[in-house]
Amino acid sequence: MKKRNLLLVVGMVLLMIPSTLFASGNSEKPQQVSICTPYLSSVTTKQMVEDIEAKLVNNGFTVVVNDSANDNSRLVTDIETSVVSGSSAIIIVSVDPKICETQINEAADAGVAVFGCDAGYIDSMQMNASSDNYQMGEMISTYLFDKMGKEGTFVHLTHRPHPGVVQRSYAMEDVLKDYPNITLISEHHVDVPNQINNSKEIVENLLTTYPEKGSIDAILCAWDEPAIGATQALQEAGRDEVLVVGVDGNEQAIKLIEEGTNFKATLAQDFLGMAELVATDVTKVLNGESVEKGEKYVPALLIE
């Protein structure tokens, strides 16, 4: 009888082991973080996404990266899917939160913490790490207009749907008011992705319209890829008198500056610093700590 009872107890214990292990596995499952961006084709955006992903994985989280490829409706769907799939946090990268404000608010209401990197900020988010884009717009515009001798003509290449880029364009408009002898000939929207080739094509067409040297003195680009495309077009056309500036400080831009091309200056953003700041705050929040909410700026540096 004792032997039979012992066998029954052992059998019950063995039956309990799988379910116990399963329950334990569930409780130890890593929290999921979703990264959502429409601009993974951009060198700098890709750099930030990869840096954030690496740091969060190292901190023990599972990371899912969603690239909506410049499709805002797909971006909205990616955020909604991130909530439904059980993400504990969502990071929007290079996104104006106003585009997806409803989805961000719904995510926050569902208990999902939302963060931004090189994005904008709304109250339902935890924070956004970026450069002070308006200040950078002031810096690069002032640099270029002074470099032009405070007179002449220029063209502006931009992409106003991007929250940081549009702030730089606003700053350019304000700075231009202090330079009455400088004229903005035209502003052009640059397609993303394919921004280098599109910018090159835009400038090639401009050079056809303005074939004489001195008809265009400068091209102000709101970020580096358009400046790279503009520089390529100018070099091929032999228009080495036209000044070009950009923002971001990516490797190809710095190389063109060092080679003495039309590309004269850029502002180097600390994208690694932004990524580190976001990854740190995400980790704190998901570990039950509180963080200071709002915009958090990382300084930029002029390279010429």
Language model features with spans:
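Short beta-strand elements in bilobed, periplasmic/extracellular small-molecule ligand-binding domains
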Residues: V57-S68, F154-H156, L176-I196
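Hydrophobic alpha-helical segments within soluble ligand-binding/sensing domains
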Residues: L75, A129-F154, V166-Q167, I196-K200, ...
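Short, low-complexity disordered leader/linker segments with a strong preference
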Residues: M1-Q32, V57-N58, T62, N105-V112
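Flexible loop/hinge segments that line or gate small-molecule binding clefts
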Residues: P97-Q135, Y143, T153, N250-E259, ...
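Extracytoplasmic "Venus flytrap"
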Residues: Q32-L56, V63-T81, S85-S87, V93-P97, ...
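Hydrophobic alpha-helical
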Residues: E80-S85, A89-A108, M172, V192-I254
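Hinge/cleft segment of the Venus flytrap/periplasmic-binding protein
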Residues: Q31, G164, D174-Y179, D270-E304
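Short, solvent-exposed amphipathic alpha-helices that sit
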Residues: T44-N59, M136-I140, G164-T183, N198-I202, ...
